[in-house]
From Swiss-Prot:
Organism: Ricinus communis
Protein keywords: Metal-binding, Metal-thiolate cluster
Metal-binding recorded as keyword: yes
PANTHER family the record matches: METALLOTHIONEIN-LIKE PROTEIN 2A (PTHR33543), METALLOTHIONEIN-LIKE PROTEIN 2B (PTHR33543:SF33)
Example of a GO MF term: metal ion binding
InterPro entries (UniProt xref): Metalthion_15p
Pfam families: Metallothio_2 (PF01439)
The name this protein goes by in its record: Metallothionein-like protein type 2
Length: 80
C-alpha cells in the first residue's frame, strides 16, 4: 500500500523519498547536502482571541504541511 511498511519520507517531486524515517514527512536529504534550522516563536496575547489562531499553526509545523497519502505520496504536496 505504501513504501517502507507505511513509514514514508517525502522526496522531490512529491514522490516516495529515500529517508523512510516515519510519516513525519521531512524531505529526504543527507546532512552533507543541506542543513535547515527552523525556529518557532510563540507568544501569549492579552486577549484570548489572539491565542486561538496560534494553536492551529503549531499543529501544521509539526507535520511540515505534508501527510502520508496513497502509494506513499504527499497529501497535500507542500513539502519543502
Amino acid at each position: 500500500m505504501s513504501c517502507c511498511g507505511g513509514n514514508c519520507g517525502c522526496g522531490s517531486g512529491c514522490k516516495c523519498g529515500n529517508g523512510c524515517g516515519g510519516c513525519k514527512m521531512y524531505p529526504d536529504m543527507s546532512f552533507s547536502e543541506k542543513t535547515t534550522t527552523e525556529t518557532l516563536v510563540l507568544g501569549v496575547g492579552a486577549e484570548k482571541a489572539h491565542f486561538e489562531g496560534g494553536e492551529m499553526g503549531v499543529v501544521g509545523a509539526e507535520e511540515g504541511g505534508c501527510k502520508c497519502g496513497d502509494n506513499c505520496t504527499c497529501n497535500p504536496c507542500t513539502c519543502k
